[in-house]
Amino acid sequence: MPILDIRPYHLRAHIAWLDDSGERPHIAIANGPDTVFPPAWKDQDMVVFNIDSEAVQYCNVDADGITFMARFQGQPFEVRAPLNAIQWVASQNGAIKIPFPQLA
């Protein structure tokens, strides 16, 4: 049996830990061919999203990456990003910033 990628487990754990600690988790996502950003940000190299449970809906982390629904300029939009696009997870104020491991 192959070893599973540990990154989705780390990401879910970091998000839950920040949330349980009373922090609002934020995630930095690098733009790339498999990343889906709101149209206003499609030209940005990297975007930081508030992924607190009050800010997004249907946040899902799995072996394919992260997806969540959020409102941008009043319109719902599904953000999608592969695991390799995730740069870091942090608290809102930046006091806690956890770099996310990349695979070659």
Language model feature labels by segment:
Residues 1-104:
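Eukaryotic intrinsically disordered, low-complexity regulatory linkers and tails enriched in Ser/Thr/Pro
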